[in-house]
């Protein structure tokens, strides 16, 4: 069940997405599907809260770039079909169709689509230099925001693990644990989980503590 806080922040997120009400209603319906336990309204609301809290420190709170960040957050998980490996590509396609008549340039629309596609493998995106173009840093920011739940306190991290398990009932416990631990191991082996200094300062240490706790004896 969506909390009042999550509903408020999800609505605030949608208010920054320059699409017609019909498109926003369709997105809301997708995100409120009964099959979504983790990748739903609450997840998007959390990312938007964290963006609003920390973006200014990274120089990413100006209206133009914030609009694009809002669009990427809003649509990055809009297609979430268990067992498929093309959810990100299909989410990008939904975004491109929904935004076809939006007051955005083709460059802007494609930036959002490519950012959505990049969430298929957060670690594959190169670490942008401190003086990198704004849009390169903004893409890394969206990817890092999406990983911030990995840096939650123990109890919240464990609850997220339970919610993720509910989204894949077709897997056995052994299959789920194998995939989950492989993902955590890859993150643990990475030099950095978060490429943006502000989010690294807030979440890196706790994320690595969570990985270590989960991988003990693995």
Q: Where does each model-flagged region fall?
A:
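His-Asp-centered metal-binding catalytic motifs of divalent-metal-dependent phosphohydrolases/nucleases
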Residues: 47, 66-82, 91, 112-120
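An amphipathic alpha-helix signature
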Residues: 7, 11, 24-25, 48, ...
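Histidine- and acidic-residue-rich, metal-dependent catalytic cores
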Residues: 91-126
């Amino acid at each position: 069940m969506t909390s009042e806080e999550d509903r408020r922040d999800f609505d605030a997120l949608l208010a920054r997405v320059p699409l017609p009400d019909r498109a926003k209603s369709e997105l809301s319906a997708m995100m409120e599907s009964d099959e979504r336990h983790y990748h739903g309204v609450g997840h998007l609301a959390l990312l938007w809260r964290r963006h609003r809290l920390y973006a200014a420190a990274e120089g990413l709170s100006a209206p133009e770039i914030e609009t694009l960040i809002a669009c990427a957050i809003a649509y990055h998980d809009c297609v979430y079909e268990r067992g498929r490996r093309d959810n990100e590509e299909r989410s990008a396609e939904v975004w491109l169709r929904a935004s076809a008549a939006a007051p955005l340039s083709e460059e802007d629309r494609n930036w959002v689509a490519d950012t959505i596609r990049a969430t298929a493998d957060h670690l594959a995106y190169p670490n942008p230099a401190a003086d990198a173009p704004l849009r390169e840093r903004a893409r890394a920011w969206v990817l890092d925001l999406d990983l911030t739940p990995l840096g939650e306190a123990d109890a919240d991290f464990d609850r997220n693990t339970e919610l993720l398990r509910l989204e894949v009932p077709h897997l056995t416990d052994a299959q789920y644990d194998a995939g989950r631990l492989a993902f955590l191991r890859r993150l643990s082996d990475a030099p950095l989980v978060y490429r943006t200094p502000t989010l690294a300062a807030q979440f890196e240490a706790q994320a690595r503590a969570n990985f270590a706790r989960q991988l003990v004896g693995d």
